[in-house]
């Protein structure tokens, strides 16, 4: 029995026969940030990190995508899922949060930003493919990390990971994370976790983008290919 290929949500099914059946899958797939994203809270701020690969099916559409999206001066989000969906949600939240800040005449809270993401992702949960991590700093609570996975749930965590590559590093982050880590330790922790995920996950790759957010502001850096941590694979000696 001939198998019927079903394309991603929002696109037409791929034909089972004819000239179009042999067309590359990226012609029928939506752009996805397949991805590995991460955020860690430290005393005085947060660190965010993400890979930079965007895929359309098996085709790498962009090698240097910026998945760390600014929502306000000291609030960022990490995006995973459909690139179109996550960009649209991030733009809408940025717009709403900007007006909220103007009305209050003060910087918005990180919790407020996360709640806006949660509300939108839950309301349109049947239509969106978006997993988002919100992290930032505000004067009331300091550094905070919130996770809004697909479906619209919101939970605050000391650290959060997401995306297709996250399944490869749950053991590493659980074993390595500890309370009281410094900013530098969190940056190294995030870089190591992302590098491990990028080695195993075909939808994660490119460069590593990092951001440290604290009261003074945002510090961003990019780890290029020769700067990404390398992990050797043990091999048995020849017999």
Curated annotation (Swiss-Prot):
The modification Phosphothreonine is found at residue 69. The active site is at residue 35. The keyword Repressor does not apply. One of its GO terms (cellular component) is nucleus. It is found in: Cytoplasm; Nucleus. Belongs to the peptidase T1B family. This is Proteasome subunit beta type-6. It comes from Bos taurus (Bovine). The lineage of its organism: Eukaryota, Metazoa, Chordata, Craniata, Vertebrata.
